[in-house]
Amino acid sequence: MPENRIARLLKKNKKLLIAYYMPEFPVPGATLPVLEALQKNGADLIELGIAYSDPIGDGPVIQDAAHTAIRNGMSVKKLLDLVRQARKGEGCRKITAPILLMGYCNPLIAYGGDCFLQDAASAGVDGLLLPDLPPEEADDFLERAKGFGLTVVFLVSPVTPPERIEYIDSLSTDFSYCLAVNATTGTAKLSDAGSEAAIDEYLRRVRRHTRKKFVVGFGIKDKARVGHMWELADGAVVGTALLQHIAGAGTPEETARLAGEFWQTLQ
């Protein structure tokens, strides 16, 4: 099976700027214009949230975005339909950036596990990040995902011991996703990790115990923070700050404009 877009991107050995977006937030019809704006303005990889009514690991901004998306008609099926349209260039310029879906297991189980993997791969999804999938119970899922050419990403946190970092690194298909602090998404503050020095030492520890690449997310809000994360990791994920910037938009066009303008400030 040929390499997917994520594997090809990582081979370029460049520092990555990764966007997290909740499809159909804040208004219906925003998804395709936002994807186009993010790609046009330099997003290397686009992470799409799977809207879920009980996103316990997410902060209030992403929880609110998920609830808004559901009210706007978002579902797993619609998400895959939107990815398919984006890949074909229907409703926007063709999206060629890698797409990673992030969400919880319950909606995927309700959809049908193997059916979801098959439909995600055929739609043009490149990988999955499921925070509530325990690595110790993931062997079967990993094999099935691999069969469909999908990357699977696991999480590392500041309290993950070295031997478990190595284990997670071995399981993640192409890269690991490193939480910058112990906090729900988008609520991170330096004080949560003790100090800037504590975060830096934590990321150096992750580097010592990983062989694959890793990216850092949760709480990254501006160009300075992106640059600092690039010094220590292989990529930075910006999500909550993006959602906050576009939250007041009233049309898909305004949403896309705001998304593009914000993304330019991170370069």
Curated annotation (Swiss-Prot):
Pathway where this protein functions: Amino-acid biosynthesis; L-tryptophan biosynthesis; L-tryptophan from chorismate: step 5/5
Record has Lyase as a keyword: yes
Single GO term (MF): tryptophan synthase activity
Active site residues of this protein: 47 (proton acceptor), 58 (proton acceptor)
Catalysis: reaction(s): (1S,2R)-1-C-(indol-3-yl)glycerol 3-phosphate + L-serine = D-glyceraldehyde 3-phosphate + L-tryptophan + H2O
Cellular-component GO terms for this entry: cytosol
InterPro entries: Aldolase_TIM, RibuloseP-bd_barrel, Trp_synthase_alpha_AS, Trp_synthase_suA
Role of this protein: The alpha subunit is responsible for the aldol cleavage of indoleglycerol phosphate to indole and glyceraldehyde 3-phosphate.
Name of this protein: Tryptophan synthase alpha chain
Gene name of the encoded protein: trpA
